[in-house]
A protein has these predicted regions:
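Short hydrophobic/Thr-rich beta-strand motif most characteristic of the beta2 strand and flanking loop
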Residues: 43-50, 58
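Receiver (REC) domain active-site loop signature in two-component systems and cognate sites
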Residues: 73
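Non-catalytic signal-transmission and effector/linker regions of two-component phosphorelay proteins
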Residues: 1-21, 87, 109, 125-138
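Acidic catalytic/metal-coordinating carboxylates
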Residues: 50-54, 77-81
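Alpha4 helix (beta4-alpha4-beta5 surface) of REC/receiver domains from two-component response regulators
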Residues: 80, 93, 102-121, 127, ...
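Active-site residues of response regulator receiver
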Residues: 70
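Charged docking surfaces used in two-component/phosphorelay signaling
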Residues: 33-41
Length: 138
């Protein structure tokens, strides 16, 4: 009877964060693409949507662990996307990180405070975003 032995090849090392899926939603395609590359380099699976309607379709079809979302976008703004996404996937309620250049706008500020969501003000340090993602994933 022939016996096979494993030659000790490397088993794939899977970081627990490697399987976490992130959706980046921003109408600034350059920023969204840059965030996609940076987060993928940190071993996250990253998908991108360039407006809120596209994001809503993706959220309905896929189970994301974190959504990084701009607030001011065409078609469906970030605050409306957040409220609708929670209806589709209640688990996303505390999994949004908003990125905005308008944090001093009274309406946006009210939304961010009232919903008690995480947010970063553009321009933000990449390390701050990565830390925020890791914190949400706990």
């Amino acid at each position: 009877m022939k016996s096979e032995s494993h030659s000790g090849g490397l088993e794939p090392h899977v970081n627990s964060l490697a399987l976490k899926a992130i959706l980046v939603v921003d109408d600034d395609q350059q920023l969204a693409s840059a965030l996609q590359w940076i987060l993928a380099d940190e071993n996250f699976l990253v998908d991108v949507a360039f407006d809120g309607e596209e994001a809503l379709v993706k959220i309905a079809a896929h189970d994301y662990d974190v959504v990084i979302c701009d607030l001011k976008m065409p078609k469906l703004q970030g605050d409306a996307l957040y409220l609708r996404a929670r209806e589709i996937r209640p688990s996303l309620e505390d999994r949004f990180i908003f990125i905005t250049g308008y944090a001093t706008d009274p309406i946006i500020r009210h939304f961010l405070i009232e919903q008690e969501v995480k947010f970063l003000v553009k321009p933000f340090p990449i390390g701050g975003l990565i830390n925020c993602v890791r914190e949400l994933l706990g």
